[in-house]
From Swiss-Prot:
Gene Ontology terms describing biological process: urea catabolic process
MF terms (GO), sorted A to Z: nickel cation binding; urease activity
Source organism superkingdom: Bacteria
Compartment(s): Cytoplasm
Organism, as annotated: Brucella abortus (strain 2308)
Protein name from the UniProt record: Urease subunit gamma 2
Length: 100
């Protein structure tokens, strides 16, 4: 199987997101890279499912809460930007303060 660099990056994001969600389900708090992976995977999946940029941005606010992550992680993530391919083309999705 041959993957482009972009496809490889998406695969790594989804793998890390899966590991992070398993840890979250065990009651463990997520660290910075895990939180970024979960939010990024949410954006990529939302685009793939046919959601609009606005729907993805609104839904991302409910993915992780401050109780789900280690202390200080919400402060480290004032902005996450993910490029995703939507039905109308590639868009840069900006998540401002995604962890509430």
């Amino acid at each position: 199987m041959h993957l482009t660099p972009r496809e490889f990056d998406k695969l790594v994001i989804h793998m890390l997101s899966d590991v992070a969600l398993k840890r979250k389900n065990k009651g463990l708090k997520l660290n910075h890279p895990e939180a970024v992976a979960v939010l990024s995977a949410y954006v990529l999946d939302g685009a793939r499912e046919g959601k609009t940029v606005e729907e993805v941005m609104d839904g991302a606010r409910s993915v992780l809460k401050a109780d789900d992550v280690m202390d200080g992680v919400p402060d480290l993530l004032p902005l996450i930007q993910v490029e995703a391919v939507f039905s109308d083309g590639s868009r840069l999705v900006s998540l401002h303060n995604p962890i509430t």
